[in-house]
Design a protein with these regions (language model features):
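Phosphate/dinucleotide-binding and metal-coordinating scaffold of catalytic cores
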Residues: 1-250
Length: 250
């Protein structure tokens, strides 16, 4: 209750989605450029969600993991996730907050088998991440544009990964959600219809093919009973010429 909007922005600092950065940041960035232990990240996320007082990590690990593991903060969403850099050739994972070489790409990882993970007071079933991956495959078959998604298997767990579309060749891309642009809270249902969303898209001069893509997503969400289609899950990307485009679905 004491965590204000300003506190959240200061906590986000330079680690948020998109290109916006907030100063002064309330926490220092970890500059440790080393491989990340996925199992330890999952354990840390479970400890946070369980509100355990004793987390069995040393001070540096706590700093590193607390900046990587996002629980409903800068990466958005209700479930624990991490912003990572992944080397597909070696399968190594490093912090997604650091500048990385060309062998690494930026990804967002949603954890499997995290205690107390879920939304609206409901705890996820085991391997919920595989269900999300199945929806990704169905969306592709339906012509929905999405970033590359993978399943990262580790120690018997299957973590869902999606490649970040707000990072291109290591550079930040300006991104805003419909909720942020239209000042609409995703927590209040029925404040924004698909028709209203399309109207906002016309106001920022999205090309017609983006409007058509948005219509396809609307149909897919209805048919596939995806009820997570709120205003924070509709976003736009701006290029350096100031032109907006509909982001990939997520």
């Amino acid at each position: 209750k004491d965590f204000t909007a300003i506190d959240r922005l200061c906590y986000t600092g330079k680690r948020g989605m998109g290109a916006l950065e907030y100063v002064p940041a309330s926490s220092e960035m970890s500059d440790i450029d080393e491989n990340i232990n996925v199992s330890e990240m999952v354990k840390f996320a479970s400890d946070v969600l369980n509100q355990r007082k004793l987390i069995t990590l040393n001070a540096q690990e706590k700093l590193t993991y607390s900046q990587l593991v996002q629980v409903g903060s800068s990466a958005g969403g209700a479930r624990a996730k991490a912003l990572i850099a992944w080397n597909e050739k070696t399968n190594e994972i490093r912090s997604g907050q650091l500048n990385i070489d060309e062998d690494y790409d930026y990804w967002l990882m949603k954890f499997d088998n995290v205690a107390k993970n879920g939304d609206h007071g409901l705890e996820d079933v085991p391997e919920y991440t595989l269900i999300e991956y199945a929806y990704y495959k169905m969306a592709l078959d339906a012509g929905i544009l999405m970033s590359d998604c993978r399943i990262y298997s580790n120690a018997g767990e299957n973590h869902f990964m999606t490649k970040r579309f707000d990072r291109i060749h290591g550079k930040k891309v300006h991104m805003q959600s419909l909720g942020a642009m239209a000042h609409i809270s995703y927590k209040e249902p029925r404040l924004c219809s698909y028709e209203m969303a399309a109207g906002y898209m016309r106001e920022i001069y999205l090309p017609m093919k983006d409007i058509e893509q948005f219509y396809s997503r609307m149909v897919f969400n209805c048919v596939a009973v995806n009820q997570d289609d709120h205003v924070k899950n509709i976003s736009f990307l701006m290029n350096r010429s100031g032109e907006w485009r509909l982001s990939p679905a997520y």
